[in-house]
From Swiss-Prot:
HAMAP family: ProA (MF_00412). SUPFAM superfamilies: ALDH-like. The keyword Amino-acid biosynthesis applies. The lineage of its organism: Bacteria, Pseudomonadati, Chlorobiota, Chlorobiia, Chlorobiales. It comes from Chlorobium phaeovibrioides (strain DSM 265 / 1930). One of its GO terms (cellular component) is cytoplasm. GO terms for biological process: L-proline biosynthetic process. CDD domains: ALDH_F18-19_ProA-GPR. It comes from the Bacteria. Pathway: Amino-acid biosynthesis; L-proline biosynthesis; L-glutamate 5-semialdehyde from L-glutamate: step 2/2. It is an enzyme of class 1 (oxidoreductase). This is Gamma-glutamyl phosphate reductase. It catalyses: L-glutamate 5-semialdehyde + phosphate + NADP(+) = L-glutamyl 5-phosphate + NADPH + H(+). InterPro entries: Ald_DH/histidinol_DH (IPR016161), Ald_DH_C (IPR016163), Ald_DH_N (IPR016162), G-glutamylP_reductase_CS (IPR020593), Glu-5-SA_DH (IPR012134), GPR_dom (IPR000965).
Amino acid sequence: MSMNLKETIILKLDEVRTASRTLVTLTDSTINEVLLDLAGRIAPNAAAILEANRSDLERMERSSPMYDRLLLNEKRLEGIAADIRNVASLPSPLDMTLEERTLENGLRLRKASVPMGVIGIIYEARPNVTFDVFALSLKSGNATVLKGGSDADASNRAIVELIHSVLSDHNLSPDTLYLLPSEREAATVMMGAVGKIDMIIPRGSQALINHVRNTAKVPVIETGAGIVHTYFDKSGELEMGKEIVLNAKTRRPSVCNALDTLIIHSERLGDLSELCRPLAEHQVIIFADERAYLSLLASYPEQLLQHAEPEHFGTEFLSLKLSVKTVDTLDDALEHIAAYSSQHSEAVITEDPAVKAEFFKRVDAAVVYANTSTAFTDGAQFGLGAEIGISTQKLHARGPMALRELTTYKWMIEGDGQTRPA
């Protein structure tokens, strides 16, 4: 690695740390003014952003699962602006009293929410994340260091240029947001920046997340990878099931809350053809186990139906592909989920309250659903505003990582001259 590159990044990280200390002095109204100004400038600057995005898209195959994630258009930019306005409208997550008490000696204790400080994000070809992360980080009083994928470098730099312009116009340091150089080595420097970055959140493939977890010295929160199951129970309502499965698989197949494996009770194999019929209209390729394959053979398009191999279970497809697993009991379904789940989002379709209760109790995932689509795993859908990612771990945060999850806390203690006895 070039020492010049490493030294340049380290010096810049020191400047980001300095900028982070000024953010705690900002009022929520000032932060909201910045966010609303940014949201209002997206449309006037859309041409430059979309031109940069097109240059990124030209280097990527349309068949790539990443293509849809990389794509920006006017409609998506409008949605991003709306999300930023929504973040501005949310209550501040800072200086919230989490706990309060007065001790017998008269000391008054208050536990309150405070910013993390400097948050690092390593992500792949998702330029919308650049906007989302900045909005959430600023609202929660944090500075941000970004390492985007090289596939989206032009898009990210156009977006960051706009954000820096807005920050400068509000007399805030552009060092509040730092986009690392595109070189791969920059991520290595970032992951080793103990004392300069407080937390790193990787967003992307399981391979990316594993690499960051295994390499980073800075604390890491795992997000993103979703191996998502929906179990159609023997009491499941067919028409409801058709709509849920179709929505979970085809709404946006390239995102982490999309359905990967349909589990069906063996007593409902007779309904499998009807359950999957809408999927054929969307050209969904099904990898079915033997019993499911035989049930689908006469009705599902031959070119879209294949025998499942072991690797098809436990795969995050990120495309119009689906594996189907047949089980004989609820326990079998739960065991399959436990074996292959990434602990992101799991769902059951059932009319049996006992099955629903057991599923909620025993499935170990950040979000567990009954009789609805896993597509709802999203900070905005939860009423939290845009999220930085979906945490699939249990320490600090789990599920959508929105404003509160980007804060920590400190104890503030007031006294009247008390001293601790020897």
